[in-house]
């Protein structure tokens, strides 16, 4: 099964117009927070036009965790039921461990696992399509909580079909990948080894082929474009500003300022094949976003997961 890459966040008409006119365009998959209802309606419009395929609705639990939003569980359930025929997957209202910005205790992780599981079971009883609902397992919670998700059986013998893994996205990617591989060891040795898994906020493209996940989501295409950069399959993320490097922007050394003429010509030809130019990318954030999304799509297609991609390391986590 090929990986589903969900582009996270809102997409504009300009972004979709640019992207959909690039070679061999296929409908993309999108994750949107339920807190952004206007963007969800926009995704419905794109679905109707054949531009968006799968739609993943996130609960907005992280915004609630940071204090930036309020969540009404019953209203969220009603909303999911009202759009059930439009969505592929939806996230439970989970409890993120601890308090935002503060050190976490063992009790915080125990409480988050318990409350998240209770919410998941409750939401299952209320949704039109409970199989679309994903429970969430958070970095730092006991692996017993993961085993609990995997061993659960409903009154008719049904299993959890799809679950979310929430790694600590502020952790070094090497630590994060080792943790996720240990999660997959637990999954593969469980009574539900074929469960679908979604990695929340997973931004490392090189890491994707090393993990047997079903799907990931990332908003990196927006962040890359916002910093006047684009993702190129051959060169990775490059800055296309025409400003010279300074002490304050060492991480933004411009491709335009540093690349040789052969490389510049190669990139110009690549962008021309997509229907754009380096100059247009410098001027348009929407075009930078579209070019980056196109490159990500190509990378994911050309770099599928293979067990041989994984080098087993000594276990770091107590499972």
Label the predicted regions:
Residues 1-128, 297, 304, 311-319:
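Non-catalytic, usually N-terminal nucleic-acid engagement modules in DNA/RNA processing proteins
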Residues 1-23, 77, 81, 91, ...:
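Alpha/beta catalytic cores of nucleotide-metabolism and tRNA/nucleoside-modifying enzymes
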Residues 26, 45, 74-75, 106-111, ...:
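Glutamate identity and glutamate-enriched acidic tracts
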Residues 37, 41, 86, 114, ...:
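Arginine residue identity/basic-tract feature
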Residues 64-68, 96-99, 126, 142-146, ...:
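An almost-null, non-specific background feature
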Residues 71, 121-147, 289-299, 318:
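Solvent-exposed, charged interface segments at domain starts and junctions
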Residues 101-106, 132-204, 212, 219-246:
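Glycine/Thr-rich beta-alpha phosphate-binding loop at enzyme active sites
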């Amino acid at each position: 099964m090929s990986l589903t890459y969900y582009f996270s966040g809102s997409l504009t008409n300009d972004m979709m117009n640019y992207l959909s006119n690039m070679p061999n365009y296929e409908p993309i998959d999108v994750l949107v927070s339920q807190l952004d209802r206007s963007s969800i309606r926009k995704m419905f419009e794109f679905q109707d036009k054949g531009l968006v395929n799968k739609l993943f609705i996130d609960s907005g639990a992280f915004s609630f965790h940071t204090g930036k939003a309020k969540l009404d569980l019953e209203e969220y359930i009603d909303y999911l039921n009202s759009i059930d025929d439009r969505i592929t997957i939806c996230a439970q209202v989970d409890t993120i461990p601890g308090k935002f910005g503060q050190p976490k205790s063992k009790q915080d992780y125990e409480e988050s696992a318990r409350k998240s599981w209770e919410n998941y079971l409750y939401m299952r009883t209320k949704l039109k399509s409970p199989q679309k609902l994903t429970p969430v397992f958070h970095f730092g919670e006991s692996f017993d909580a993961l085993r609990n998700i995997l061993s659960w059986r409903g009154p008719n013998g049904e299993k959890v079909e799809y679950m979310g893994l929430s790694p600590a996205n502020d952790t070094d990617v090497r630590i994060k990948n080792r943790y996720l591989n240990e999660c997959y060891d637990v999954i593969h040795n469980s009574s539900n080894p074929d469960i679908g898994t979604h990695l929340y906020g997973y931004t490392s493209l090189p890491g994707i082929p090393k993990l047997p996940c079903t799907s990931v989501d990332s908003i990196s295409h927006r962040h890359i474009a916002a910093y006047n950069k684009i993702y190129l399959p051959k060169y990775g993320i490059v800055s296309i500003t025409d400003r010279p490097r300074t002490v304050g922007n060492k991480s933004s050394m411009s491709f335009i300022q540093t690349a040789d003429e052969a490389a510049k010509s190669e990139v110009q030809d690549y962008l021309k094949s997509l229907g754009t130019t380096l100059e247009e990318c410098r001027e348009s954030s929407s075009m930078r976003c579209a070019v980056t999304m196109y490159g990500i799509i190509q990378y994911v297609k050309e770099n599928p997961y293979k067990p041989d991609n994984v080098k087993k390391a000594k276990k770091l986590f107590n499972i």
